[in-house]
Amino acid sequence: MTWSRFHNSSEPMHCAVAEREGKLLGMVHYIQHRSCWTTVDYIYLQDLFVEPQVRGSGLGRALIEHVYESAAKSGASRVWWLTHESNTDAMLLYDRIAEKSGFLQYRKLI
């Protein structure tokens, strides 16, 4: 994993953190990108992490809502993300704040 792109102002990558008393409790990073389907950008929420001891406190929702606000300010028309089908705890949150797209992901590592 590399964090160098977050420090490069020409990269459309962003990160937000939540902390209390200097301790990191959660983070989200997201990427603004173009799409062939629209003339405005999309935001891909690439990673969301919340420390286990504060899960269920609303912190994950707050981090996602930060991404929504950032997307709106940038003129993006959509925020989207992926999750593993076994991540049922997170999906309880996602089902309340977004809609399932119905798409399945296929990939081949190169």
Task: Go through the PLM ranges and name each one.
Residues H33, E51, H84:
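Residue-level recognition of the GNAT/N-acetyltransferase active site
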Residues V54, G58-H66:
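Conserved acetyl-CoA pyrophosphate-binding loop and the N-cap/start of the following alpha-helix
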Residues I64, A71-T83:
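Conserved GNAT acetyl-CoA-binding A-motif
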Residues S35-L45, R55, G102:
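A conserved beta-turn-beta hairpin within the catalytic core of GNAT-like acetyltransferases
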Residues M1-C15:
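Active-site rim helix/loop that mediates acceptor-substrate recognition in acyltransferases
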